[in-house]
Amino acid sequence: MHARWTGRILDETFENLAENRPDIPTGTLTKLRELMNRAVPDCLVTGYETLIPALTLPDEDDRHVLAAAIRAGAQVIVTANLRDFPDAELAQFGIEAKHPDEFVMDLFHLDGVRVHQAISATAAAWRNPPGTPADVCDRLAAAGLPISAAALRR
């Protein structure tokens, strides 16, 4: 598995974060974006723009996501917005859309030890306030991943 995204996807993500979480300082969001790009080698997909006009999705504004997935050779688009990524449209490119909860559960079933290690590492990185794996699971549940959170608590 190799996470990939585009500058445009990050723009949308961080605009939504800024709008929905005004308590997070702009500088923190900027730093998080930089850390994400540094943490995942070769994460930025480019050269996908010419594919956009030929694609059909219920929401035309989501075509850039599919175009980037095609360009990256992705097998999965991880999104909570499943209705705008219909199986019939994605299947012709060998791509499927998965809800983040389903995706994390797939990872858990493939290598539960590593997923638990990632949860522990995330908790250990929290400083203010300090976190525990249970806290990370609480955040996952609150973010719409209740099945994964419950599995990781076991």
Q: Which stretches of residues belong to each language-model region?
A:
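Short, basic, glycine/proline-bearing loop/turn elements
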Residues: 42-55
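Ligand-binding beta-strand-loop-alpha-helix segment within the catalytic cores
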Residues: 34-42
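PIN/NYN-family metal-dependent endoribonuclease catalytic core
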Residues: 1-22
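Acidic, PIN/NYN-like endoribonuclease modules and their adjacent C-terminal/linker elements
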Residues: 83-154
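Acidic, metal-binding active-site segment of PIN/NYN-like and related structure-specific nucleases
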Residues: 62-95
